[in-house]
């Protein structure tokens, strides 16, 4: 488990020699909960190379192609689960009447074109110059160098931003602000 702002990994396990690891960031955008907005979590499942040895940080730091599954969960007006096992992305919606997730979006793909982007405008004074230039070009709309109008979306959650991009396309930016 890794906590926002803390780059170290904190392993929590009842079985230190477990075959699989669950890595997650719980309640990304939790500030949204007090405003009755959606919050979410991102997760990944990894398989350990050596089960007979104690779990180490290296077990967690594997390249993306080695992950067994990954996804995100959204908690809001409906509860959604978006999941990949490396062969496409599927979306599931919780059916509260029966307590199961139902496949509602098979083969989700990112649209090839979008007119939206997400970035925290309150951090603009800290953005690197290329980021400032790109955002300025987008905000200038159809009269600007990009020749079309853009919509800026921001809700302080990378998980919600990732879901929005999967459904509507666009870009989520979180530039280093020092």
Where are the model-predicted features located?
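IMPase-like, lithium-sensitive Mg2+-dependent phosphomonoesterase catalytic core
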Residues: 1-178
């Amino acid at each position: 488990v890794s906590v926002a702002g803390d780059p170290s990994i904190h392993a929590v396990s009842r079985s230190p020699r477990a075959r699989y690891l669950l890595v997650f960031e719980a309640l990304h955008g939790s500030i949204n909960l007090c405003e009755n907005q959606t919050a979410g979590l991102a997760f990944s499942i990894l398989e350990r190379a050596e089960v007979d040895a104690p779990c180490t940080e290296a077990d967690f730091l594997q390249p993306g192609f080695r992950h067994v599954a990954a996804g995100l969960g959204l908690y809001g007006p409906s509860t959604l689960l978006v999941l990949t096992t490396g062969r496409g992305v599927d979306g599931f919606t919780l059916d509260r009447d029966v307590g199961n997730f139902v496949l509602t979006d098979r083969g989700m793909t990112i649209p090839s074109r979008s007119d939206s982007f997400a970035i925290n405008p309150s951090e603009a004074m800290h953005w690197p110059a290329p980021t400032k230039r790109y955002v300025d070009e987008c905000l200038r709309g159809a009269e600007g160098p990009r020749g079309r109008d853009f919509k800026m979306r921001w809700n302080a959650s990378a998980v919600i931003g990732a879901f929005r991009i999967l459904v509507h396309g666009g870009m989520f930016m979180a530039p280093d602000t020092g």
